[in-house]
Structure formats: structure tokens, C-alpha cells
Curated annotation (Swiss-Prot):
PROSITE patterns to which the protein is assigned, alphabetical: WD_REPEATS_1 (PS00678), WD_REPEATS_2 (PS50082), WD_REPEATS_REGION (PS50294)
Name of the protein in its database record: WD repeat-containing protein 55 homolog
Keyword Repeat: yes
Sorted UniProt keywords: Repeat, WD repeat
Pfam family, one: WDR55
Recorded family membership: Belongs to the WD repeat WDR55 family.
Transmembrane segments annotated in the record for this chain: none
């Protein structure tokens, strides 16, 4: 502050450093406190500001005083300061400032109760414009971010690697499968998440976890070749399919409250009924890992993708192969059904998206370039919008037929391992190799309009555009805010100027 110029130079340089640091910290605390309370600048701050300006001499006066001091032969710069001079002056200033601050704070509270029409409120409003705009806006932005209500639950962090996530169909519960064979059940909410229970189900990695359609049972498939069915109410084991496969089970798909399918690392697919002990049927049409299985609402066909590049379709009622696609020179990792069950889209290890007409799964009808990085996960958000993710750690949204990149839904620091969406379609959950689960509110997709084939678009910008759920912001948003600010200021100036008088 300017008043420091009137103090003598202390003999120890550290004293001056400590004094400046304390005063800087005090000023920062005052600004933060004022912003948190949500009030204007207090009269005490205004008085201190005025005192500082009064205590600071004019340029010419300061020059004259410096000349008089330098001409004084009795001044010794190496002499020790008297302990009473600076300390007493500082204590008096602090005491006077404290008493003045208390009085003006009480007056300000009275003025606030009376309304903003008082002179103190007017002077505070005037001096608020004199503050540093950058500092003021920064503090307000921080406080606004803190007070802004959450739109999604906070992150869940585990010590063990998370292999799969699954939302409960009716309750705000999410199941997290881990590499040590346990399943953690969390109750999630915007205010916080609560661990309900941990179920020890497998001796090896639990690769897939699913709820039945009625939400009564929890099904898990593991590397130990077993399938476990757990009753959620009693937390007891309902059924154990020991050695359900000859190889490690990789995927599990629930068809309804009784039927489910499993696929293993060797390409075998089995269909099960909870009311029976043995599988309904078993087919092996590929030689590599089953990466995903899916059915539509009619549940007549069971589709399976595999790591050796095949899309295989089974007729459930006939219990036999329906059709198998031509082989692809890439892994088929994931798929989703869109356009009223008229389109099937498959994601590959080369980042491509193949589109099939429903029922014609021998060869794709369209190929989209995708994101140019391996697509290992896909979740339908709406009937025309999909979320895809993979090794780059980004969750991207894309429009199906016509294909368009819509932007980035969310990010992880490491490759993404699993994706799921809740029953309402508003909340997306993702887990990564960093042992974390993050939630993304994707309700805004309900307002997305349909994209036409002849719509103009910029593919480069769309691929890097951050959507509202993303933790990152777009550079263009900063300039758009500035433009909006300028427009608002121009409107205010026009309103203040009023109608012009014609000559």
C-alpha cells in the first residue's frame, strides 16, 4: 500500500517481507469473504482505500520530502530503528482501522436492512467499479462454480481395477465389478455416493455384471468359468453355474427376468434359463473371444461380435445359427441398435463404425470413419445418438445415419474400460484404467434435433467440440461470452442515452 512509503526501512529485510505477506493475505481474505457473503464493498474497505490515497503524497510533494530527507545530515541509514516508532504507528493504525471497520460494518448492515437507497449503498456501488475487474470477475467465477448445484453424482474411486459397471433398472444403485472378483453396490446421487455393500462372488476377475430386468437378481460372469446369481434382498447366493464354460467367460447378456446368454474367450455362446440347471443351447461358430452380445425388443435373434472379425447371429427359437457376416480384418468390439430397430451399428478396433440393415447381417450397408482410434465401447443414448469410447480416454457422441460427430461427452486420463446408461437415459457412467467411475449428465441430448444429410458441418471442430457434460470448455465459449458482454453493454448504453432529439 502507499502508506508503506512513510515507514522507515527496517534493519532486517525479513521483517518487511513478513509484513507485506501478511497484508497481502489479509486483502485476499477480505475479497473472498466479501464475495462469499454476496455483499458489495464495505465502507471500511472504502475508508481504508481513501486513507491509503490520502496517506500517499502527490508526486511533487514526495519529491520535495525526499530532497529534504537526503539533505538532512543527521539521518543515518545504518542506525537501528527505535522499537516504538514503527510498531506503535502500526498498532495505532490497526486499532483505528479495526474500530472504524466495526462501526462502518454496523452502519452497512443497517443500510442493507433499510434498502439500497442510502448514501452508503450508493458510494459502495460507485467504488465497486473502481475495483480490479479481472480480480473481481475471477473471485465471482470461483464462488459461482462452488455454489453451482451438481448435475451428476461425484466420482467413485476404488483401490481395485474396475472391470464393468451396471445400473439397477429401478433404483439409484450402480454395481461395480472388480478384478479381484468382488462386486461393490453403491447408492448414487448428486449430493454424494454411499457404499451399500460389497459382495464377494468370484475367486478370479469378475468380467461382467448385470441385473435382471425386474432388478431382483444380480448376475456375474468371471474368469473362473462360473456364473453366479445373487439375490439382492437377502444378499445370498440363489444359483451357481459352476464351470458353466470350458474357457473363461467374457460377456453376459440378460434377455429378460429368466433368460440370459454368456460368451467365452474361445467363441462359445450359451443360452441359459434361471429355472433350469443346464443351458438351453450351446453354439460355437467363431474361434476367438466374444466381445459383446445384444438383442432387440422382439428377442428373436441373438447377435454376437467377436475378436476374430465376425458378426454372428443366432435364432433363439430355432436354437441354431441364423447368419454370419463376412470376416473383417479388424476386431468387432461393440454394437448398438438404432432407428427403431432398423439399424445395427458395430464398432471396430480400427475406429470404424459399420452399419447394417436389420436382418441383413451378412455385410454392412454403410461404413463411417469413426474417431480414428479403437472403439471398444458403445452405448445408445437416443434412437439416433450413440456414445462411443475406447483407448484415448474420451467419450464421444455421434449421430447415426447420417453420421456426424457431435462432440466430447466426457474424459478420463486413461483408457475407458466400461460404459452404461441408467433406465431414464439421463445419466451415463464410465470406468477407466485409473480405478475410477465418473458420471455424466446427458439429458441435453433430448433437445438435439435430427440431422439432415445436406446439413453443413465442420468435421474437425465437431470431433473436438466439448458438450455440456464435458469437464473441459471450448475456446470459442470464452469469446462468445465477451461478445455477449459487449452486446449487453451496448444495449445498456442505448437505453441510458434515450431517444435522440431531432433538430
Amino acid at each position: 500500500m502507499h502508506t508503506h512509503n512513510n515507514f522507515k526501512t527496517p534493519s532486517d529485510a525479513d521483517e518487511l517481507d513478513d509484513l507485506d505477506d501478511d497484508m497481502v493475505i489479509g486483502v485476499i481474505e477480505e475479497i473472498a469473504q466479501e464475495a462469499l457473503v454476496g455483499e458489495d464493498v464495505s465502507d471500511s474497505d472504502i475508508d481504508e482505500h481513501d486513507l491509503a490515497d490520502v496517506g500517499a503524497p502527490e508526486h511533487n510533494q514526495n519529491a520535495d520530502e525526499n530532497e529534504s530527507i537526503s539533505s538532512d545530515s543527521s539521518f543515518d541509514p545504518n542506525a537501528e530503528d527505535s522499537s516504538d516508532s514503527d510498531d506503535s504507528m502500526l498498532e495505532e493504525d490497526e486499532a483505528e482501522g479495526a474500530s472504524s471497520g466495526e462501526a462502518t460494518s454496523a452502519k452497512r448492515r443497517k443500510d442493507d436492512n433499510d434498502g439500497p437507497c442510502g448514501s452508503a449503498a450508493d458510494s459502495a456501488a460507485v467504488d465497486l467499479d473502481d475495483l480490479d475487474d479481472e480480480t473481481d470477475e475471477t473471485v465471482r467465477a470461483i464462488i459461482a462454480a462452488i455454489k453451482k448445484p451438481r448435475s451428476a453424482p461425484p466420482e467413485i474411486k476404488l483401490e481395485d481395477f474396475i472391470t464393468d459397471v451396471c445400473f439397477h433398472p429401478d433404483r439409484d444403485i450402480i454395481a461395480l465389478a472388480t478384478i479381484i472378483g468382488d462386486v461393490h453396490l453403491y447408492e448414487y446421487g448428486n449430493e454424494g455416493n454411499k457404499l451399500l455393500r460389497t459382495i464377494e462372488v468370484h475367486s478370479k476377475a469378475c468380467r461382467d455384471v448385470e441385473f435382471t430386468e425386474d432388478g431382483r437378481y444380480l448376475l456375474t460372469a468371471s474368469k473362473d468359468k462360473c456364473v453366479m446369481v445373487t439375490d439382492l434382498e437377502t444378499e445370498k447366493l440363489k444359483k451357481l453355474y459352476e464351470t458353466a464354460h470350458d474357457d473363461a467367460i467374457n460377456k453376459l447378456h440378460v434377455l429378460d427376468e429368466n433368460l440370459f446368454a454368456t460368451g467365452d474367450d474361445a467363441g462359445t455362446v450359451k443360452l441359459w434359463d434361471l429355472r433350469t440347471k443346464n443351458p438351453i443351447f450351446e453354439l460355437k461358430e467363431v474361434e476367438d473371444q466374444i466381445t459383446q452380445m445384444i438383442t432387440n425388443d422382439q428377442k428373436k435373434l441373438l447377435l454376437a461380435t467377436s475378436a476374430d472379425g465376425y458378426l454372428t447371429t443366432f435364432n433363439i427359437a430355432a436354437r441354431k445359427l441364423y447368419v454370419q457376416s463376412e470376416p473383417y480384418e479388424e476386431e468387432l468390439n461393440c454394437m448398438g441398435i438404432y432407428r427403431g430397430s432398423s439399424k445395427l451399428v458395430v464398432g471396430t478396433s480400427k475406429g470404424k463404425l459399420y452399419s447394417y440393415n436389420w436382418g441383413y447381417f451378412g455385410y454392412h450397408c454403410d461404413m463411417y470413419p469413426g474417431i480414428k482410434s479403437p472403439v471398444s465401447l458403445m452405448i445408445p443414448i437416443t434412437d439416433r445418438i450413440a456414445c462411443v469410447a475406447g483407448e484415448d480416454g474420451n467419450i464421444r457422441a455421434c449421430h447415426i445415419t447420417p453420421y456426424r460427430n457431435l462432440g466430447v461427452v466426457g474424459q478420463h486420463n486413461m483408457p475407458i474400460e466400461s460404459l452404461d446408461i441408467n433406465t431414464s437415459g439421463e445419466l451415463l457412467a464410465s470406468s477407466s484404467h485409473n480405478n475410477d467411475v465418473r458420471f455424466w449428465n446427458v439429458k441435453y441430448f433430448e433437445d438435439f434435433g435430427d440431422i439432415k444429410y445436406n446439413d453443413k458441418h465442420n468435421a474437425y471442430k465437431e470431433k473436438r467440440h466439448n458438450l455440456p457434460s464435458s469437464k473441459c470448455t471450448n475456446a470459442s465459449d470464452f469469446f462468445s461470452d465477451l461478445t455477449k458482454e459487449d452486446e449487453d453493454n451496448a444495449d445498456n448504453n442505448d437505453a441510458a442515452a434515450g431517444p435522440s432529439n431531432s433538430a
